[in-house]
Amino acid sequence: AVEKTNSSSSLGEVVDRILDKGVVVDLWVRVSLVGIELLALEARVVI
């Protein structure tokens, strides 16, 4: 079920709500300049 609210939520409230639903989010970001890899983004969601 998707919950919609009219009030704005902080990032902490959103993460708390997601964790209460039993969802695990793994997010990994890497940005390099001298090593040339400017952006790498990896995300995994486990329900």
Curated annotation (Swiss-Prot):
**Superkingdom as given in the UniProt entry:** Bacteria
Provide the protein's localization. Answer: Gas vesicle shell
Query: Does the record bear RNA-binding in its keywords?
Result: no
Q: Where is the signal peptide?
A: none
Q: Output the Gene Ontology cellular-component terms.
A: gas vesicle; vesicle membrane
Q: RNA-binding: present as a keyword of the record?
A: no
For this protein, the record's InterPro entries field holds: Gas-vesicle_GvpA-like, GvpA, GvpA-like_CS
Q: Name one Pfam family in it.
A: Gas_vesicle
Ordered alphabetically, the record's keywords are: Gas vesicle
One example GO MF annotation: structural molecule activity
**PANTHER family given in the database record:** GAS VESICLE PROTEIN A1, GAS VESICLE STRUCTURAL PROTEIN 2-RELATED
Query: Per the similarity annotation, which family is this?
Result: Belongs to the gas vesicle GvpA family.
Q: How does it assemble?
A: The gas vesicle shell is 2 nm thick and consists of a single layer of this protein. It forms helical ribs nearly perpendicular to the long axis of the vesicle.
Question: What is the documented function of this protein?
Answer: Gas vesicles are hollow, gas filled proteinaceous nanostructures found in some microorganisms. During planktonic growth they allow positioning of the organism at a favorable depth for light or nutrient acquisition. GvpA forms the protein shell.
What name does this protein carry? Answer: Gas vesicle protein A
This chain's source organism reads: Dactylococcopsis salina (Myxobaktron salinum)
